[in-house]
Amino acid sequence: MTILRDYKLSGRKAFAVLLDPDKVEQDAFSTLLQRTADYPVDFFLVGGSLVTDYAHKEVIATIRRYSSTPVILFPGNPLHIESSADAILLLSLISGRNADFLIGQHVIAAPLLKKSGLEILPTGYMVVDSGTQTTVSYISGTMPLPHDKPDVAACTALAGEMLGLQLMYLDAGSGARRPVSAAMIAAVRKAVNVPIIVGGGITSGEKAYEALKAGADMIVVGNGVEQDPDLLPQLATVVREFNQSVVQA
């Protein structure tokens, strides 16, 4: 989606909400979508590392009823392809060494993606240690990047960019005890020119601002925005004010 690159080139930042179909509670979900009229988000991501309900189509249909915001799939496996979305993050788990998540799943998904009409976003997916084991680390059988090793993350991202990946996604994971560090985001920002997405552990406006200032082009928050009524306006306001400061500068 060229809009992410446009955001980066302009210096503007994006805000995305990640919706896990397994964790969507319908009443809270509808309320969240209505609130985005006052506190806009730039993208909805739909998916998760382990989705058992496969309600992607229903979740996307509900989003469409309330919003024209673009929907991007965040797939855990080839079964999570849904053509009613706008685009899909084609995730290559470059922080790990499991060939199935580097290329194996992609071989299975490729013909389905070809037919889907979705915009394909080749993404270097880097799982970062957040103080607790995440679902993606367990399912993939891989170790996350050490929280305090920004140089390792930078070299990993650089290799991904050299391989042709068009986005980098630093993810501390659902339920993270701590977010990706500003030092790691800054190191990756210095190493690569592609847009950087950062998610996991962003539980306050202050943490969102730190990620944006360090070099994140898009921040992602999960279903926690449904549970904490104050989080959506906090994050939307931080991103809006950050972008306003860029324009004024």
Curated annotation (Swiss-Prot):
One of its GO terms (molecular function) is phosphoglycerol geranylgeranyltransferase activity. This is Geranylgeranylglyceryl phosphate synthase. It comes from the Bacteria. It catalyses: sn-glycerol 1-phosphate + (2E,6E,10E)-geranylgeranyl diphosphate = sn-3-O-(geranylgeranyl)glycerol 1-phosphate + diphosphate. Mg(2+) binds at D20, S49. CDD domains: PcrB_like. It comes from Spirosoma linguale (strain ATCC 33905 / DSM 74 / LMG 10896 / Claus 1). Sn-glycerol 1-phosphate binds at Y169, L170, D171, A172, G173, S174, G175, G200, G201, G222, N223. Homohexamer. It holds the Pfam family PcrB. SUPFAM superfamilies: FMN-linked oxidoreductases. Its EC number is 2.5.1.41. One of its GO terms (biological process) is glycerophospholipid biosynthetic process. Belongs to the GGGP/HepGP synthase family. Group II subfamily. InterPro entries: GGGP/HepGP_synthase_I (IPR039074), GGGP/HepGP_synthase_sf (IPR038597), GGGP_HepGP_synthase (IPR008205), GGGP_synth (IPR010946). Prenyltransferase that catalyzes the transfer of the geranylgeranyl moiety of geranylgeranyl diphosphate (GGPP) to the C3 hydroxyl of sn-glycerol-1-phosphate (G1P). Keywords: Lipid biosynthesis, Lipid metabolism, Magnesium, Metal-binding, Phospholipid biosynthesis, Phospholipid metabolism, Transferase. GO terms for cellular component: cytoplasm. Its cofactor is Mg(2+).
